[in-house]
A protein has these predicted regions:
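Conserved catalytic core of sirtuin-type NAD+-dependent deacylases
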Residues: 1-165
């Protein structure tokens, strides 16, 4: 394999060789997990999206319609993009982020996918390393000492300055 060719964007078919069909790979992974002494769960936005916490589409328009109508619509295409919007005042910025935290962290119960993951790990040694800030691992039953949320938790969001300093 020529690494320079690889790094320049060679189509995957040129360098990926799959010895075993997908189903066999999944079965092998399941066997390895069954035999493991402990499991490290690495989770990012894809897990929460798969669980239903999507940042776009109807979930966004239903929960943020007043923001979409008031500000530049192209900047308000989903919750992620809207988080970077240069709101004219701190009150408007905090109104957005308060709604964002409510919709993604406070309001949702433990989602079935997270409950399923917890059910599989309940009696196993495990540790969770996540970039998710939606508190779903805790809601599903994982213990605080078994979770490292590298980007924090929406439930802990606060202004960097006290009110009397603003």
């Amino acid at each position: 394999m020529d690494w320079m060719r690889f790094l320049r964007g060679t189509p995957a078919g040129d360098y990926v060789y799959q010895e075993a069909p997908y189903e066999e790979q999944v079965r092998r992974a399941a066997d390895l997990l069954d035999q493991a002494d402990a499991v490290l769960i690495g989770a990012g936005a894809g897990l929460s999206a798969a669980a239903g916490l999507v940042y776009g589409g109807r979930r966004f328009t239903d929960n943020f319609s007043e923001f979409i109508g008031r500000y530049v619509p192209v900047a308000m295409r989903d919750m992620y993009a809207a988080g970077f919007y240069p709101f004219p005042t701190q009150e408007e910025r905090w109104a957005y982020w308060s709604r964002h935290a409510y919709v993604n962290r406070i309001e949702p119960p433990a989602l079935p996918l997270y409950l399923k993951v917890f059910g599989m790990m309940r009696k196993r040694e495990h540790f969770v390393l996540t970039t998710n800030v939606d508190h779903q691992f805790w809601k599903a039953g994982f213990k605080d000492e078994d979770i490292f949320a590298t980007q924090g938790d929406y439930g802990l969001i606060q202004c960097a300055k006290r009110s009397e300093e603003r």
